[in-house]
Amino acid sequence: MKYEIKIDKPVEGNGHIDLRRLVQLADIISKVAEGALQLRLRGVSITAGRKQAKLDDALRIDLVGVKKGSTRLMLECATLGETLKGIQFDAFRHEGQLQLAEQTPMSLFMNTFSDALDGTSNKEFLDKPLLNQLVAFKKVFRAPEEAFRVSNEGRTKELFVKKESLKQIAVLEESLPEPERIVLQGTVDLLQHSSSRIRVKGPDGVMDGFLSDDLDRSEVARFWTKEATVMGLVHFKPGGRRTIEVQRIFPVEQGEDYFAKQRKGENVEQQIERQLREKGGRNTAKSVVGQWPGDEDFDLLIGQLTA
C-alpha cells in the first residue's frame, strides 16, 4: 500500500526535512501503529510483557521517496493479512471493528488519530497510553502554521493534523484514570481462536481481558470454564469501557478468606463505597467491578492467596 505524508509550510523549505524531525516522526508513527495493533489483538495498547518478535515485520513502514510541493514523504507498507499469517483475525471481529487483515501500520495510525479527533466516534480502539502517544505528535511540529496531511490514494479518508488540534486529545487522555489493581471471582472463559483473550463472568457483571505474557498458558488452562480468583490490572478506555490484564489466577478456594471481607447483602461496588467512606476517601474508579480499596499491598495479597 502507498501512502503520502505532506507537510504544509515546512520550516526547512519545500522538499526538505530535518533528519532529526524525520526520526521523531517515524518513531511516533511506529509507536501509534504498534499500540493500535496491540489494542486490537489484546485489549490494551501497552503491556509490561516482552514484545512479540513476529510483530516486527507487520509494523514495517518503508520511506521510498521525498518530493517537493511542500514536503511530501512517500511511504509503503504491507497489509496485516500478508504479514501476520498466524493470527486468527476472526477471533477479534465484532460490531464496529475494522477488518484487521486489511489494515496496514499506516492505516492503523491514521484511523487511531481520526478516532481521537472525531467527536462522534465511540473511541473503542483508544486507551490512555495510546492517546499519550498521539499527544506526543506535537514534538514533530516546528512552527504554528505547519500542518500534516496523510493520505492513501483515496482509499482512506485524509488525515489532517495541526498542533492546535492535539489539545482536545490531551484533554481526553487526562480524563482517563491510570490502571488500577483488581481482585475478582468468576467463571473464566477463553475466547475462541485466541490463546490470550479471556472473559471473566462474575456475580456483578462480565469483564473482558487478556493474559499477561508472564502467565504460563498451560498452567492457566486448568481454570477454563471454572470458578477462579483473578488478580491483575484493569485498564480504562473512553466511554466507561475497561479491560483486565490478568496477572495471576488462583483456585476459587484460595480467595475465600479475601472475599469473606464483604458484608452480607453487599455487592462488590457497594463494599468499595462503604469502606472508602469509612476511611474518608472517595471512589475514583466507581465503575470497576471487584476492585478493592487499595490499602492492601498487592504482593501481600498474592502471598495470602498462595499461602
How would you name each of these model-derived features?
Residues D189-S212:
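OB-fold (S1/OB) nucleic-acid-binding surfaces
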Residues V161-R181, S218-A221:
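Short boundary/loop segments of OB/S1/cold-shock single-stranded nucleic-acid-binding domains
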Residues S151-E153, V171-P177, G186:
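Long amphipathic N-terminal alpha/beta scaffold segment
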Residues M1-L166:
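Protein-protein interaction interfaces in oligomeric scaffolds
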Residues D214-M231:
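Short nucleic-acid-contacting surface segments enriched for D/E, G, S/T with interspersed K/R
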Residues H235-Q262:
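OB-fold/S1-family single-stranded nucleic acid-binding modules
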Residues E178-S194:
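Structural detector for short beta-strands of small beta-barrel domains
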Residues Q270-A307:
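Short linear interaction segments
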